[in-house]
Amino acid sequence: MLQGSSQHSGRDAESQALRHLQQHGLRLLAQNWLCKRGELDLVMLDGDTVVFVEVRYRKHTQWGGALGSIDGRKRQKLILAAQLFLQSESRWSSHPCRFDVVAIDGASGAEARLNWLRNAFDS
């Protein structure tokens, strides 16, 4: 039950992040893109730039919050997955790329705080 609730909250956070990014003019290229190196939550297009978006949700911030949950190992997995995406979707391989994080902290709904961090880390 807890796992289902956690997965549901994650999907809700992804939907909220997607809406927020689309309201700011980004266009969805892929969602929950899976490969042998992991998963890309959202792949968006911002003008001519391919944006790999990691969505993190934490109900409580006592252990560092959503942003604090992205460590070096997670960043490396995202970079490898992004490389595989660009190899498999060659039409985007010549475009500039960046890694963004959408961090959502707090209970879901109106009380949750969404923080969109552009260029969160370099590859």
Swiss-Prot record:
Signal peptide coordinates: none
Protein name from the UniProt record: UPF0102 protein PFL_5073
SUPFAM superfamilies per the UniProt record, alphabetical: Restriction endonuclease-like
Family statement drawn from the similarity comment of this UniProt entry: Belongs to the UPF0102 family.
NCBIfam families: PRK12497.1-3, YraN family protein
GO molecular function, one term: nucleic acid binding
The organism's taxonomic lineage, starting at the top: Bacteria, Pseudomonadati, Pseudomonadota, Gammaproteobacteria, Pseudomonadales
Domain of life: Bacteria
